[in-house]
């Protein structure tokens, strides 16, 4: 798994990621990638140019910015995409990415901010030529740090379960992220069972 933060840290980190992602692909490993742009580390334009070069080696893409995916006319397929995109728009974008890079899975979260302490989260997910939309979960925030990583780790875990339906994969990833928002610190210290209970509409209760 690769994060877009690492190549932003230094030129040497960038060179290391270049070598690692190519070596992983050569070995037949599944490569997951979260572009994860941080404006405090580099410009959007530089990040887009660098991170987009990794796409031919990526199997699972988690997030669609700041990469570029060009149409035949040179425009980006994501141009005009809102913060609350429709299912049809996400389906169009996912299919355009898949057409160019032939990925196993693509995911993108959508966050609704109701207040500083109350948000909702859902995700769109693409696999096997079809787009899926998760349930929308509402939650109170204890600590937002690590929510994106919890989504990524939840998605990766779910993808490793060979018998899970696509709907369960995306709903598990969203529930994993939501669960992290109730836990202080960077790490999602919870269990698969707790995430599944939340995924299946059980009460939001972090059990210690």
Positions of PLM-derived features:
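Conserved post-catalytic alpha-helical subdomain immediately downstream of the catalytic base
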Residues: 135-201, 206-208
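Ribokinase/PfkB-type carbohydrate-kinase core domain
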Residues: 1-131, 137, 164, 188, ...
